UniProtKB/Swiss-Prot annotation:
NCBIfam families with a match to the protein in the record: PRK02259.1
Broad EC category: hydrolase
Phylogenetic lineage: Bacteria, Bacillati, Cyanobacteriota, Cyanophyceae, Synechococcales
Annotated catalysed reactions: an N-acyl-L-aspartate + H2O = a carboxylate + L-aspartate
Any GO MF annotation of the entry: hydrolase activity, acting on ester bonds
Cofactors named for this entry: Zn(2+)
Organism: Prochlorococcus marinus (strain MIT 9301)
Annotated family: Belongs to the AspA/AstE family. Aspartoacylase subfamily.
Record protein name field: Probable aspartoacylase
């Protein structure tokens, strides 16, 4: 394995402050060099972080497009230019090339500590399987959603998002900080084991595969006219079947799930997703057998 540099990003969203604090604490205690691998710690969106807002112009975590967006002279959005900088500086062909990117996020939803993957890349599966095996973390596999693209970790050959919640925006929570520190340290340990060919993958891993998103009930003007049903609050990762309540509207009417297919919801009531017209996303559960190819591709870096 020839991984030489790994990028750890916090503050991709400026009002998610706990990952920034965790990295600050962690980097003071731990050397940036770890058995020949250098770790780069960076705030993804420093301007938004300074202002305590999610972003300045557009969502940075939707700004890493595959084509046409990496010309700084063609776009005046702060986040697009910031994405350009991060790729130019730390991308695989950048001045400080990183082979892996880990993006740290918090959520207002009760997601616990979870892993988010984008697509079915072997190297991503390898890291995710090791973390799930160690901590039992749920994995949200996001793929094939044309409405949501341009995620940061997709711009690197390997990358995972670590998502921890629930915690309010711009609110420090030491328990959340401690969880991030634990995950960062464990990632470094697992990557070191991979480098020295000391890992054994679990036989399988369980993933929750993105299927779509559900908007809030809306009135004739398009305004939100319903809230998350009390029975659904804090029930991320819990199965929903036909007839289960989803929303309670302003007239007291319960909006139920009407499909026959079982689903598992994630990001229930995430505050930042209201602007995206998402009350929750939903998934199907899938068991995936581990493959030797995952480790082999890591070794081929």
């Amino acid at each position: 394995m020839t991984v030489q540099r790994i990028l750890i990003v916090s503050g991709t969203h400026g009002n998610e402050i706990n990952p920034v604090w965790a990295v600050k604490q962690f980097s003071r205690k731990e050397n940036s060099l770890n058995n020949g691998i250098e770790y780069e710690y960076i705030i993804g969106n420093p301007a938004a972080y300074e202002k305590g807002c999610r972003y300045i112009d557009v969502d940075l975590n939707r700004s890493f497009k595959e084509s046409g967006n990496f010309d700084q002279h063609k776009n005046s959005f702060y986040e697009t230019n910031r994405a350009n900088f991060l790729v130019d500086e730390f991308g695989i062909d950048g001045s400080k090339p990183c082979q892996i990117a880990i993006d740290l996020h918090t959520t207002t939803a009760n997601m616990g500590t979870s892993i988010v993957m984008y697509g079915r890349r072997s190297k991503d599966f390898c890291l995710a399987a090791l973390l799930q095996n160690k901590f039992g973390l749920p994995i949200y596999l996001h793929e094939k959603d044309k409405a949501q693209t341009g995620f940061l970790v997709e711009a690197w050959p390997c990358g995972l998002v670590i998502e921890i919640g629930a915690v309010a925006q711009n609110f420090y929570d030491q328990n959340i900080v401690n969880r991030f520190s634990l995950i960062i340290g464990s990632l470094r340990e697992e990557i070191d084991k991979l480098k020295n060919k000391l890992v054994e993958l679990p036989k399988e891993l369980v993933v929750h595969v993105h299927q779509g998103s559900i908007d809030y009930p809306r009135d004739e003007k398009g305004d939100i006219d319903g809230i998350i049903h009390p029975a659904r609050i804090n029930q991320d990762w819990k199965m929903i079947k036909k007839g289960d309540p989803l929303f309670l509207d302003s007239q007291g009417i319960i909006h139920k799930y009407e499909r026959d297919k079982l689903i598992w919801p994630v990001f229930i009531g995430e505050v930042a997703y209201k602007e995206k017209k998402i009350a929750m996303s939903y998934t199907k559960k899938e068991v995936i057998c581990s493959k030797k190819q995952w480790v082999q591709e890591f070794e081929s870096f």
